[in-house]
Curated annotation (Swiss-Prot):
Pfam families: FCH (PF00611), SH3_9 (PF14604). Residues 11-282 form the F-BAR domain. Regulates the morphogenesis and endocytosis of caveolae. Lipid-binding protein that is able to promote the tubulation of the phosphatidic acid-containing membranes it preferentially binds. Plays a role in intracellular vesicle-mediated transport. Involved in the endocytosis of cell-surface receptors like the EGF receptor, contributing to its internalization in the absence of EGF stimulus. Essential for endothelial organization in sprouting angiogenesis, modulates CDH5-based junctions. A motif (NPF1) lies at residues 362-364. Residues 25-274 form a coiled coil. Widely expressed (at protein level). Belongs to the PACSIN family. It is a peripheral membrane protein. Homodimer. May form heterooligomers with other PACSINs. Interacts (via NPF motifs) with EHD1 (via EH domain). Interacts (via NPF motifs) with EHD2 (via EH domain); this interaction probably stabilizes the caveolae. Interacts with EHD3. Interacts (via the SH3 domain) with MICALL1. Interacts with RAC1. Interacts (via SH3 domain) with DNM1, SYN1, SYNJ1 and WASL. Interacts (via F-BAR domain) with CAV1; this interaction induces membrane tubulation. Interacts with TRPV4. Forms a complex with EHD4 and MICALL1; the complex controls CDH5 trafficking and coordinates angiogenesis. GO terms for cellular component: adherens junction; caveola; cell-cell junction; centriolar satellite; cilium; cytoplasm; cytosol; early endosome. This is Protein kinase C and casein kinase substrate in neurons protein 2.
Length: 486
């Protein structure tokens, strides 16, 4: 009940009570909230599925990029395999996260969607059938009691008004006795007023008590009817709560990769791959394929022969090919076939270079003939090899010429500048960049569309020009990325 009327206590119950008229609406609203919570849970799982998909894509892209970098990079042997195993782990884990995404959307999401559709039925006029049924049930259960309560409130108000009038009449009579100007007739009227007020108080009190008694008589039935409708709402909510618990347990199983057998296998195999890395074996392989363990075609005495096609000198053999191919000599061993892609380097050449190669690789000619060989390094740049391949220098022949010595102090320290020589050929031309270009190697220029620079060498057969930025930096750039300034 909303108010308990007791002459001795007069305790007022909180107006927030469920039994107050209209306070059942919170229970009715819970039904609408259940429908909204189904939508919220679906949105929650949908966002998580998107995160799983994005993470899987990022893992795949990361693994692809780093696999290429490692395979083309300087790492070799069993440590290279261990490193690549980390990328394999990412690719396999990516597949598992895509499976998680599929499970969340195809199973959990759809399950909630179907349950929501079955549990809540929309009406033509708006709202849900379940909400209206609960609203009507509570209203019907509360209507008789609310009517009696209204009568009690009216009787209460009338009784309190009568009591107030009685108190006011008594106060006026007391004041009139102290006033000598009032005649007996006026005093008699005040006394009659008091008597009438007392009768009204008794009458309204009797009606008030009678109304309360009737209200008390209807209260048990009211409580029973309200409890019955409330329990129906509780049963409906219990189904939703149990369903949510069931779905969340399914979500937990789909998200928990630690219980997936293939997930454990991934990291067990990754650990085995890393532990299989053997530094001693890698060093032995490098010694056999790139170190003192390599075979050598030591110079031997060669008889002169009139058949030049069969007795070409080593110098003349190099002139007969269009390019110079440097290939590591395979040794007998377990890992003789594990040469990196950077082990073989193809260098295009031209007739002018052939002459210089001839002179620079002859160990018996004067050193004065090798002065121009350094500048030819730039003319044999191959743009389609990795940065690691470009930085490797393997001489095709022995020479005491420092320009062809891969172990000279300049090359060993990595400080040689291919543009230190005066490489300017032809007339310098001012050009303007048509597009943005970001240099991919240390000897390439970077610029933005609209930037101006100076072309100092014409386009080569690879489609590259040499230019100089206004900052003084000299390097290569694609010829079709610029136009001459008129």
């Amino acid at each position: 009940m909303s108010v308990t009327y007791d002459d001795s206590v007069g305790v007022e119950v909180s107006s927030d009570s469920f039994w107050e008229v209209g306070n059942y609406k919170r229970t009715v609203k819970r039904i609408d909230d259940g429908h909204r919570l189904c939508g919220d849970l679906m949105n929650c799982l949908h966002e998580r599925a998107r995160i799983e998909k994005a993470y899987a894509q990022q893992l795949t892209e990361w693994a692809r990029r780093w696999r290429q970098l490692v395979e083309k990079g300087p790492q070799y042997g069993t440590v290279e395999k261990a490193w690549i195993a980390v990328m394999s782990e990412a690719e396999r884990v990516s597949e598992l996260h895509l499976e998680v995404k599929a499970s969340l959307m195809n199973e959990d999401f759809e399950k909630i969607k179907n349950w929501q559709k079955e549990a809540f039925h929309k009406q033509m006029m708006g709202g849900f059938k379940e909400t209206k049924e609960a609203e009507d049930g509570f209203r019907k259960a509360q209507k008789p009691w609310a009517k009696k309560l209204k009568e009690v409130e009216a009787a209460k108000k009338a009784h309190h008004t009568a009591c107030k009038e009685e108190k006011l009449a008594i106060s006026r009579e007391a004041n009139s006795k102290a006033d000598p100007s009032l005649n007996p007739e006026q005093l008699k009227k005040l006394q009659d007023k008091i008597e009438k007020c007392k009768q009204d108080v008794l009458k309204t009190k009797d009606k008030y008590e009678k109304s309360l008694k009737e209200l008390d008589q209807t209260t048990p039935q009211y409580m029973e009817n309200m409890e019955q409708v409330f329990e129906q709402c509780q049963q409906f909510e219990e189904k939703r709560l149990r369903f949510f618990r069931e779905v969340l347990l399914e979500v937990q199983k789909h998200l928990d990769l630690s219980n997936v057998a293939s997930y454990k296998t991934i990291y067990r195999e990754l650990e085995q791959s890393i532990k299989a890395a053997d530094a001693v074996e890698d060093l032995r392989w490098f010694r056999a394929n790139h170190g003192p363990g390599m075979a050598m075609n030591w110079p031997q005495f060669e008889e002169w022969s009139a058949d030049l096609n069969r007795t070409l000198s080593r110098r003349e053999k190099k002139k007969a090919v269009d390019g110079v191919t440097l290939t590591g000599i395979n040794q007998t061993g377990d890992q003789s076939g594990q040469n990196k892609p950077g082990s073989n380097l193809s260098v295009p050449s031209n007739p002018a270079q052939s002459t210089q190669l001839q002179s620079s690789y002859n160990p018996f000619e004067d050193e004065d003939d090798t002065g121009s060989s350094i500048s030819e390094k730039e003319d044999i740049k191959a743009k389609n090899v990795s940065s690691y391949e470009k930085t490797q220098t393997y001489p095709t022949d022995w020479s005491d010429d420092e320009s062809n010595n891969p172990f000279s102090s300049t090359d060993a320290n990595g400080d040689s500048n291919p543009f230190d020589e005066d490489t300017t050929s032809g007339t310098e031309v001012r050009v303007r960049a048509l597009y943005d270009y970001e240099g991919q190697e240390h000897d390439e220029l970077s610029f933005k569309a609209g930037d101006e620079l100076t072309k100092i060498e014409d386009e080569d057969e690879q489609g590259w020009c040499k230019g100089r930025l206004d900052s003084g930096q000299v390097g290569l750039y694609p010829a079709n990325y610029v136009e001459a300034i008129q």
